[in-house]
Each structure stands twice: as C-alpha cells, then as structure tokens.
Amino acid sequence: MEPGMLGPHNLPHHEPISFGIDQILSGPETPGGGLGLGRGGQGHGENGAFSGGYHGASGYGPAGSLAPLPGSSGVGPGGVIRVPAHRPLPVPPPAGGAPAVPGPSGLGGAGGLAGLTFPWMDSGRRFAKDRLTAALSPFSGTRRIGHPYQNRTPPKRKKPRTSFSRSQVLELERRFLRQKYLASAERAALAKALRMTDAQVKTWFQNRRTKWRRQTAEEREAERHRAGRLLLHLQQDALPRPLRPPLPPDPLCLHNSSLFALQNLQPWAEDNKVASVSGLASVV
C-alpha cells in the first residue's frame, strides 16, 4: 500500500514531551480551574491536549475556566494545539432539561458554532440597528394620505398688496416731486397727515425711487439714440455733393483724339474756372 493511502488510524504516534503545555497545565496546583484531562482520563495523545477551536468552545466550564467538559474535542489532525482568538460566552442549558448534543469534533463540523455568542457580535448587531434607524428616521414621520402633490408642504401665503386711495397717491406723488428722500420726522408727519403708517410711507418712497431711476435710465438711453441719429444725419449733410453726370459726347470730338481727351477732362473742372476759361476765349 502506498504511503499516501494510509488511513487516520495508521498515522504515527507522537511521543509526549516533559515540558509541553499539557504537562504544565495539568499540574496538581490547578485541580479544579486548570486544564483537565481529555475523554477517558488520558492526559496525552490525541484526546488529552487542549483544543482552542470553535467546536471545543461549548465545553468551557463555569466562571471562565478553561477546562473542557466531557464531549469536547481535543487536538486537531497532526497534533496541533489551537487557541481561540476570542473567548465565547457560556451558552445557557436548554429550557427543557434535555442534554446538549455536542457537535462533531474537529474544525470541519458546524454543530458547535450554532450556539456561540461573542462580544463583537453584539456590538455589530447594535451598530447595524443604529444605522438602520438613522436611515429610516426621515421616513418615520406621519405622512398625509392622498395624491403625491398633496403630501408636499403647502407654500407660505403671500401678504396681500396694500392699496392706497387716489388722494393719498396724489399727495405722495406731489411730495416725491419736491423731495426724493424724507427724514424720519418728515416721514412720520406725512404718514400722520395721510392716515398711513410709517412703514407704508417708507416702502412707497423706496418703490417710487426705484421706478424713478429706471425711468431716468430709459430716458437717457432714448436721448442717446436720438443724438446718435442726429449726428449721423449731420455728417451725411456735411459730405460733398456727388459730381455732375458727364455730358453726352460730341460727335465732332469722336473723330479727333485731342478734342475727345479735352472733353473728358471738362467734367472735373469747376464752374468758375470753366467760366473764366470761356471768358478768356471770348476775349481772344
């Protein structure tokens, strides 16, 4: 038979050493709280060593003792001692008084993990619950039943616009034409005379000044456009008039090149020069 086909019963037996963990923990000074012997009273071998795996955690004794109870597994395959990273809390016995069924030994079984409770598990559950509560808090308020648009918060109602009488508006306009800004005493006196509040007079003057500035800016812009159009018209009038149209060619000049050239130069001559030249010709 090949060495790789050997079963678990054909594995070589490891001889115990005198300074191992089993000998130190199983001394006479810890009769009740130390690490006890394994199943069948064996202190060495596969069932005598302490196992720290999760499946051996259900055998922990009361008051934080590390001694495994009967039914807990020992050393894993190969004689390796496993120490748990966290000490699990003791599991209370079942309510019916039935004996707890031990899970399968070794790390491959999952029966011992069913009832284990670690401190970090409680904190994780508490953290997840807090996060869920915080996430659902905006939706936990009371919502009105109906159309989705009806569930929205109704908008604030606007304050109705104050209307003044014709006599009040005329007096305010007359005062605004004389004085654009009012002092506190003048505003109070005008409000008392018109049977208005100080805030109403102040608001009316503010709105009227805004309207006055807008009208003034529009008037200035219109004047600027009118001035631009007037300047353009004056520039067009200041430009020289176009030249006279050329005279029809004389049939006599068409047969003489010199007379034809002289006739072509005649439109560029000024009226006074033409008159002087004609006068000189008549004198001669």
Curated annotation (Swiss-Prot):
Domain of life of the native organism: Eukaryota
Keyword Transcription recorded: yes
Paired cysteines (S-S): none
PROSITE patterns, per database record: HOMEOBOX_1, HOMEOBOX_2
Listed GO MF terms: DNA-binding transcription activator activity, RNA polymerase II-specific; DNA-binding transcription factor activity, RNA polymerase II-specific; sequence-specific DNA binding; sequence-specific double-stranded DNA binding
CC per GO annotation: chromatin; cytoplasm; nucleus
Functional summary from the UniProt entry: Transcription activator that binds DNA elements with the consensus sequence 5'-CGGTAATTGG-3'. Binds DNA via its homeobox. Required for normal cell death of enteric neurons in the gastrointestinal tract. Required for normal development of the enteric nervous system, and for proper development of normal motility of the gastrointestinal tract.
UniProt-annotated location(s): Nucleus
Keyword set, alphabetical order: Activator, Developmental protein, DNA-binding, Homeobox, Nucleus, Transcription, Transcription regulation
CDD domains found in the cross-reference section: homeodomain (cd00086)
Biological process annotations from GO: animal organ development; enteric nervous system development; mesoderm formation; negative regulation of dendrite morphogenesis; positive regulation of transcription by RNA polymerase II; regulation of transcription by RNA polymerase II
Compositionally biased tracts (Pro residues): 87-96
Protein encoded by which gene: TLX2
Region (Disordered): 1-50, 78-106, 139-166
Regions recorded as binding DNA: 157-216
Organism per entry: Homo sapiens
Compositional bias annotation for Gly residues: 30-50
Protein name (record): T-cell leukemia homeobox protein 2
